[in-house]
Amino acid sequence: MARSLLLPLQILLLSLALETAGEEAQGDKIIDGAPCARGSHPWQVALLSGNQLHCGGVLVNERWVLTAAHCKMNEYTVHLGSDTLGDRRAQRIKASKSFRHPGYSTQTHVNDLMLVKLNSQARLSSMVKKVRLPSRCEPPGTTCTVSGWGTTTSPDVTFPSDLMCVDVKLISPQDCTKVYKDLLENSMLCAGIPDSKKNACNGDSGGPLVCRGTLQGLVSWGTFPCGQPNDPGVYTQVCKFTKWINDTMKKHR
């Protein structure tokens, strides 16, 4: 049961970015998952603060990464092209410009998405590809995959070096509202497996929830400790923001 309803909102919202000096968030990870098949998520990126994991993200364009708004920093190092953090063969690209959705709220995490503009283009390859943005929203019951380098244990943390994946199912707003009450907003999407620990956790924030080959969610928040049965993970529902994503990339080319 979500004890979070009794906690202050900033504690309840597992804002899933690893804490760094001067930043507001605390991270999310993959619980009860397994290493992703090598190269199966070529759009996955890690946002680093120095060499430390801060958040996940997803490549939507050679110059643009989509992530959660609560992952905002002044500067980013973007890791892409390898499932292993610290791999010297990976591309590492600096980024200093980011654009939060104008409707984002630090209190409720509504509209929790942000575009990060890379200082130079990513080199596309078999290991670096753009994710496909959705043309429609997927229905409840759809099986999706969430991925990230976040902690695999909670409340104690154990961070993997290899990208982790777990399959979850989309949950209807009606069923998710039974857990989170008025904390759930129209821009949010819930996913999980009933009576299972399968979920995202610290460090996974901003990472992709991919359903049938399209990006449907970005890891946003959940209850703590992570992986509590019947407490779904909460994601930003990307299908409701495709126009903002495309308009923002065009405006800031």
Curated annotation (Swiss-Prot):
<keyword id="KW-0378">Hydrolase</keyword>
<dbReference type="Pfam" id="PF00089">
    <property type="entry name" value="Trypsin"/>
</dbReference>
<dbReference type="GO" id="GO:0005576">
    <property type="term" value="C:extracellular region"/>
</dbReference>
<dbReference type="InterPro" id="IPR001254">
    <property type="entry name" value="Trypsin_dom"/>
</dbReference>
<keyword id="KW-0732">Signal</keyword>
<dbReference type="GO" id="GO:0004252">
    <property type="term" value="F:serine-type endopeptidase activity"/>
</dbReference>
<dbReference type="GO" id="GO:0008544">
    <property type="term" value="P:epidermis development"/>
</dbReference>
<feature type="active site" description="Charge relay system">
    <location>
        <position position="205"/>
    </location>
</feature>
<comment type="similarity">
    <text>Belongs to the peptidase S1 family. Kallikrein subfamily.</text>
</comment>
<keyword id="KW-0865">Zymogen</keyword>
<feature type="glycosylation site" description="N-linked (GlcNAc...) asparagine">
    <location>
        <position position="246"/>
    </location>
</feature>
<dbReference type="GO" id="GO:0051604">
    <property type="term" value="P:protein maturation"/>
</dbReference>
<feature type="domain" description="Peptidase S1">
    <location>
        <begin position="30"/>
        <end position="250"/>
    </location>
</feature>
<dbReference type="GO" id="GO:0022617">
    <property type="term" value="P:extracellular matrix disassembly"/>
</dbReference>
<feature type="active site" description="Charge relay system">
    <location>
        <position position="70"/>
    </location>
</feature>
<dbReference type="GO" id="GO:0008233">
    <property type="term" value="F:peptidase activity"/>
</dbReference>
<feature type="propeptide" description="Activation peptide">
    <location>
        <begin position="23"/>
        <end position="29"/>
    </location>
</feature>
<dbReference type="GO" id="GO:0030141">
    <property type="term" value="C:secretory granule"/>
</dbReference>
<keyword id="KW-0325">Glycoprotein</keyword>
<feature type="signal peptide">
    <location>
        <begin position="1"/>
        <end position="22"/>
    </location>
</feature>
<dbReference type="InterPro" id="IPR001314">
    <property type="entry name" value="Peptidase_S1A"/>
</dbReference>
<dbReference type="InterPro" id="IPR018114">
    <property type="entry name" value="TRYPSIN_HIS"/>
</dbReference>
<keyword id="KW-0720">Serine protease</keyword>
<comment type="function">
    <text>May catalyze the degradation of intercellular cohesive structures in the cornified layer of the skin in the continuous shedding of cells from the skin surface. Specific for amino acid residues with aromatic side chains in the P1 position. Cleaves insulin A chain at '14-Tyr-|-Gln-15' and insulin B chain at '6-Leu-|-Cys-7', '16-Tyr-|-Leu-17', '25-Phe-|-Tyr-26' and '26-Tyr-|-Thr-27'. Could play a role in the activation of precursors to inflammatory cytokines.</text>
</comment>
<dbReference type="GO" id="GO:0001533">
    <property type="term" value="C:cornified envelope"/>
</dbReference>
<keyword id="KW-0964">Secreted</keyword>
<feature type="disulfide bond">
    <location>
        <begin position="137"/>
        <end position="239"/>
    </location>
</feature>
<feature type="active site" description="Charge relay system">
    <location>
        <position position="112"/>
    </location>
</feature>
<feature type="disulfide bond">
    <location>
        <begin position="176"/>
        <end position="190"/>
    </location>
</feature>
<dbReference type="GO" id="GO:0006508">
    <property type="term" value="P:proteolysis"/>
</dbReference>
<keyword id="KW-0645">Protease</keyword>
<dbReference type="InterPro" id="IPR033116">
    <property type="entry name" value="TRYPSIN_SER"/>
</dbReference>
<dbReference type="InterPro" id="IPR043504">
    <property type="entry name" value="Peptidase_S1_PA_chymotrypsin"/>
</dbReference>
<dbReference type="InterPro" id="IPR009003">
    <property type="entry name" value="Peptidase_S1_PA"/>
</dbReference>
<keyword id="KW-1015">Disulfide bond</keyword>
<feature type="disulfide bond">
    <location>
        <begin position="201"/>
        <end position="226"/>
    </location>
</feature>
<dbReference type="GO" id="GO:0005615">
    <property type="term" value="C:extracellular space"/>
</dbReference>
<protein>
    <recommendedName>
        <fullName>Kallikrein-7</fullName>
        <ecNumber>3.4.21.117</ecNumber>
    </recommendedName>
</protein>
<feature type="disulfide bond">
    <location>
        <begin position="55"/>
        <end position="71"/>
    </location>
</feature>
<feature type="disulfide bond">
    <location>
        <begin position="144"/>
        <end position="211"/>
    </location>
</feature>
<dbReference type="GO" id="GO:0008236">
    <property type="term" value="F:serine-type peptidase activity"/>
</dbReference>
<feature type="site" description="Major binding site for inhibitory zinc or copper">
    <location>
        <position position="109"/>
    </location>
</feature>
